[in-house]
UniProtKB/Swiss-Prot annotation:
Glycans are attached at residues 96, 252, 485, 605, 699. The active site is at 558 (charge relay system), 641 (charge relay system), 673 (charge relay system). Extracellular dipeptidyl-peptidase which removes N-terminal dipeptides sequentially from polypeptides having unsubstituted N-termini. Contributes to pathogenicity. It comes from the Eukaryota. It is an enzyme of class 3 (hydrolase). Pfam families: PD40, Peptidase_S9. Gene3D superfamilies: alpha/beta hydrolase, TolB, C-terminal domain. This is Dipeptidyl-peptidase 5. Residues 1-19 form the signal peptide. The gene is DPPV. GO terms for biological process: proteolysis. It comes from Trichophyton rubrum. It is found in: Secreted. Keywords: Allergen, Aminopeptidase, Glycoprotein, Hydrolase, Protease, Secreted, Serine protease, Signal, Virulence. Induction: Expression is strongly increased during growth on protein-rich medium containing keratin.
Length: 726
């Protein structure tokens, strides 16, 4: 009943100013990247929408007309997990998650103009995804990825034998990574071939593991690796994949290589950029990513960092010739931005890259032979770029993107021309109605060492003559940013439409503003970033009349959670009515319990046992800091967060309770560093927004705002009195 009551209240209040509710946010359609056909006439994309009444998320695939932006349904079959163009007109290959092989998938072939008339080409004996295709004579070679057994077979969970014991035994790191205990299975790229007979293709079920022959290699690399970690040459004969350096400790170093291997696996894969190798530029030992073959297959572009233990070092474009021993070339190596993806133009002369720049994911172009000091040119588009694909053989690309004001922006972008809008979700979806760029603006403030950027996000129906409490949202990372991006978890617009003006700062440590700002947080977590936040708060307090700082709140996750815990023990903590710390560190020395040791060993200038003073310097649990605690605080921490153990949140809550500080602990036993399940996300929003609304006064000024009591989950409260009542 509570959930139903809350839904009714939310809808009723929408006309009064709170237009965008958590339920709108969670149930709004989610669309994937749009992939154009070879001729550049149609694009296919995935769409899903959560239904709170039925507790399910049906999904399907749509077609986008690249001339007029019209959208038509291709299929509503939720079992179709991915679709890719065959390379022959409008014919497609798709993977169906249900198959006659238990635990396997089916490979099907159809035509986008007659999708129902499909036929099955064959089965894959296990979970398989990330298809990439290339014609090789009268055959079609493909690659994809799945889990590998130690013997190199595709792992099939449904067919696997149940272990006689639940014990795990380790002789090396990782023990666990992100949200999973590391097991004997690992990701691997597999190759196969579609053979043509008459007018149909068939697959014999035989796959070749291209990764397993390299001991300790893994590709795509978890937890976020996918099809961008490998590529297939246009003639279908050569595969490139990225793996962390097999010979180095993966938990301590970020070093990774780009491997080349024949599609048929006739030779063992070899790295082209091995550390201290004959082709590798001197001093380049960091993480590699985004391998992409040139159209003629003679060159391969990829991105690589220099530092061997720093996941946020600047990426530089590298180009290697295939089949030679010539040194790898660095392209535009002095460009002070960190590219994230790279692609070749159809003539192989121009590179298109995405990179974050001033809190926006932008698209750039540069010559494939650009010199070190070359500055790439920006291609005009709206919002931030998530992915892009060339439209036929033209210079134009189809961009799939998003922004702070829309969760899907499909547009055509061409160098030196205005962009052309195809479909913007906020103009189509009723859940996003009213959202737009007019409620977003940048703010620049003099920080501790340089000017610091923030986003200001205003509520629907904003009136500059009224006053709104401040919602001060601190991003994670710490080497991350509040970008002009749509977040499916921490969405500033959801907070704003409770009746706040959101200020989302990008303090020292943030990405996209030059490498120096990113690097300057090293061994200074509670130093310059905290001072930046103080200066931003002071500027808002002194100069922005429509923001009420006296009733403001602060919230953050991950590093943002740490910063909230740090703020609680500082003078700034007394400026807020309430705090929210999600998955933040509390005790300095507990950082050794994390998974990726390279992260803390870089950020604190040494190992836990050699540089202990650096870990202790920014310890939120210091007695002199805890003595200052008084601001009501909600603590959120989840059981499957293996980056920051749930004990961090429990310990923080223990101290808040014993101190008599009004506090609450929110825990999801089935969530990780993030809360992603729809029903859990709704409860998260009810609790987090209900908490800040209670203490900021929003509940009093707006009786239809979210309240803690709107959440249907019963609160555990075993004691009638606090510790200090006795």
């Amino acid at each position: 009943m509570a959930a139903a009551k809350w839904l009714i209240a939310s809808l009723a209040f929408a006309s009064s100013g709170l237009a965008f509710t958590p339920e709108d946010f969670i149930s709004a359609p989610r669309r994937g990247e749009a992939i154009p056909d070879p001729k550049g006439e149609l694009a296919v994309f995935h769409v899903s929408k959560y239904n709170f009444d039925k507790k399910d998320r049906p999904s399907g695939w749509n077609l986008l007309n690249l001339k007029n932006g019209d959208i038509n349904v291709l299929t509503t079959d939720s079992d179709v997990s991915e679709i890719t163009w065959l390379g022959d007109g409008t014919k497609v290959v798709y993977i169906n998650g249900t198959d006659s092989v238990k635990g396997g998938v089916g490979i099907w072939i159809s035509d986008a103009k007659n999708f129902g008339n499909a036929y099955k080409a064959g089965s894959v004996n296990g979970a398989f995804s990330g298809l990439k295709l290339a014609k090789s004579g009268d055959k079609i070679n493909f690659v994809g990825y799945g889990q590998s057994t130690t013997k190199g077979d595709l792992y099939n969970e449904a067919a696997a034998k149940e272990a006689v014991s639940s014990a795990r035994i380790y002789d090396s790191l990782f023990v666990r990574h992100w949200d999973t205990y590391v097991g004997t299975q690992f990701n691997a790229v597999f190759s196969g071939t579609l053979t043509k007979s008459g007018d149909k293709y068939s697959f014999d079920g035989k796959l070749k593991n291209l990764v397993q022959p390299v001991k300790y290699a893994e590709s795509p690399y978890p937890p976020f690796g996918g099809s961008g970690d490998y590529d297939l040459s246009s003639d279908g004969k050569t595969v490139a994949f990225m793996s962390k350096a097999p010979e180095l400790p993966k938990a301590n170093l970020t070093t990774s290589y780009i491997f080349l291997v024949p599609h048929d696996g006739s030779r063992v894969a070899e790295p082209i950029n091995k550390r201290n190798g004959p082709r590798t530029p001197q001093g380049i030992e960091g993480a590699s990513s985004s391998p992409v073959f040139s159209p003629d297959g003679k060159r391969i572009a990829y991105l690589q960092m220099a530092a061997k233990n720093y996941e946020s070092d600047r990426r530089v474009i590298h180009i290697a010739e295939v089949g030679t021993n010539k040194p790898v070339q660095r392209i535009a190596s002095n460009w002070d931005r960190s590219p994230e993806a790279v692609k070749w133009s159809s003539d192989g002369r121009t590179l298109y890259v995405t990179a974050e720049d001033h809190a926006t994911g932008k698209l750039f172009t540069l010559p494939a032979d650009a010199r070190d000091n070359h500055k790439p040119a920006v291609v005009k588009h709206d919002g931030s770029v998530s992915s892009f694909y060339f439209i036929g053989s033209s210079k134009s690309v189809l961009i799939s993107g998003n922004s702070l004001w829309s969760n899907a922006l499909y547009q055509v972008a061409t160098p030196d021309r205005p962009n052309r809008k195809l479909f913007y979700a906020n103009e189509h979806d009723p859940e996003l109605k009213g959202l737009g760029p007019n409620d977003i603006e940048p703010l620049w403030v003099d920080g501790a060492r340089t000017k610091i950027h923030s986003w200001i996000v205003k509520p629907t129906g904003f009136d500059k003559n009224k006053v709104y409490p401040l919602a001060f949202l601190i991003h994670g990372g710490p080497q991350g940013s509040w970008g002009d991006n749509w977040s499916t978890r921490w969405n500033p617009r959801v907070w704003a439409d409770q009746g706040y003006v959101v200020v989302a700062p990008n303090p020292t440590g943030s990405t996209g503003f030059g490498q120096k700002l990113t690097d300057d947080i090293t061994n200074d977590w509670g130093g310059a970033p905290y001072k930046d936040l103080v200066k931003i708060w002071e500027h808002v307090h002194d100069h922005i009349k429509y923001i009420d700082t006296d009733n403001g709140i602060a919230a953050g996750a991950s590093f943002g959670g740490f910063m909230v815990n740090w703020i609680q023990g500082q003078d700034l903590g007394r400026k807020f009515k309430a705090l929210v710390s999600h998955d933040g560190t509390f005790v300095g020395s507990s950082k050794i319990g994390t998974d990726e040791l390279f992260f803390i060993e870089h950020d604190f200038n040494g190992t836990f046992f050699e540089a202990r003073q650096n870990y202790d310097r920014w310890d939120c649990s210091k007695p002199e800091l805890v003595a200052k605690w008084s601001t009501p605080q909600l603590v959120v921490h989840n059981d499957f967060d293996f980056r920051l153990s749930v004990a961090e949140g429990v310990g923080l809550f223990n101290v808040l309770q014993e101190k008599g500080v009004p506090s609450r602990f929110l825990n999801f036993p089935d969530e990780t560093h993030w809360v992603t399940k729809p029903e859990n996300s709704l409860v998260w929003h009810q609790q987090v927004l209900g908490w800040v609304n209670k203490w900021s006064g929003i509940n009093k000024s707006n009786p239809k705002s979210i309240k803690l009591s709107d959440c249907p989950i019963e609160v555990v409260d075993h004691e009638a009195h606090s510790y200090f009542d006795y």
